[in-house]
Amino acid sequence: MDAFQSILKFFLNQKTAIGYSFMALLTVGSERLFSLVAFKCPCSIENTAYGLVFLFAPAWVLLILGFFLNNKAWRLFTGCCMNPQKIFPRRRCCRFFYVLGHITLSSLVAPVMWLSVALLNGTFYECAMSGTRSTRLLEMICKGKPKECWEELHKVSCGKSSMAAMDSEEVRLSLQAQSQILGWCLICSASFFSLLTTCYARCRSKVSYLQLSFWKTYAQREKEQLENKLLEYANKLSERNLKCFFENKKPDPFPMPSFAAWEAASELHSFHQDREHYSTLHKVVDDGLEQTPQEEETTMILVGTAQSL
């Protein structure tokens, strides 16, 4: 039993890495499925449009899904049309762009994975580049090749070109090599940028490493317990209402947070060094509805947590 709990604890502690690994495997599988089942290069002047659509359209869909599935995005935008100060509070307008930037970076993970895998495979890029009409690109691709390369480049990816088999294979390998080089450049750039932004966020942290670790643990536990409490109180309230309805009785008072309390607890968290609140809910419970002066607050997002604080 102890061994099972240790294994479970290990997986819970590494769930972020496991999640990214699962996302990478899912991306690789999806790309291979697209390449083998859905992708059929037309071998015509439409090659460029067809290849680029298969290369970038799934990445765009993944980006949109990333925003849809990001809880921080909905926490940021819910009710903003009715009360614009939720996202643009006084003297803290930059906070909105800071949080939006963090949401965007999180949503870009899946699209970058897709583009990287697709470029490393080379199928989509090969089809797209074989349909180019750019003289400059044709000179680069068909350098040292017969004139048929200029006229029938769009047929190379299908093996229907009148060029010699060796020349046609060299062109295909050259296009695939270009695609793989771009793929590795994208992976290296994304990795370096991720490291850079993480280091910058840690360097700008207002709390120490140990306090940050405690903050992450608290945020996760609060999130789990909040979900349980929401379910518990929803069950109690629905049970009370149904019972009173069917028994035709007047309901007893049911303690619930006020509308203002719900609004205050739903705001983005701003860290105050003199008053160490680890979440918006923590702040509301300690201070009620009194607001801390906003110019003394600093918006912070915990890297690697599932909740915006």
UniProtKB/Swiss-Prot annotation:
Residues 1-15, 71-99, 201-309 are cytoplasmic. The chain crosses the membrane at residues 16-37, 46-70, 100-129, 175-200. Disulfide bonds join 41-127, 43-158, 142-149. Residues 38-45, 130-174 are extracellular. One of its GO terms (molecular function) is monoatomic cation channel activity. One of its GO terms (biological process) is ATP export. The keyword Hydrolase does not apply. The keyword Thylakoid does not apply. It is a multi-pass membrane protein. It is found in: Membrane. A 1,2-diacyl-sn-glycero-3-phosphate binds at residues 32, 37, 121, 202. GO terms for cellular component: plasma membrane. InterPro entries: CALHM. Keywords: Disulfide bond, Ion channel, Ion transport, Membrane, Transmembrane, Transmembrane helix, Transport. PANTHER family: CALCIUM HOMEOSTASIS MODULATOR PROTEIN, CALCIUM HOMEOSTASIS MODULATOR PROTEIN 5. Belongs to the CALHM family. Oligomerizes to form undecameric cone-shaped channels. May assemble to form large pore channels with gating and ion conductance likely regulated by membrane lipids. This is Calcium homeostasis modulator protein 5. It comes from Rattus norvegicus (Rat). The lineage of its organism: Eukaryota, Metazoa, Chordata, Craniata, Vertebrata.
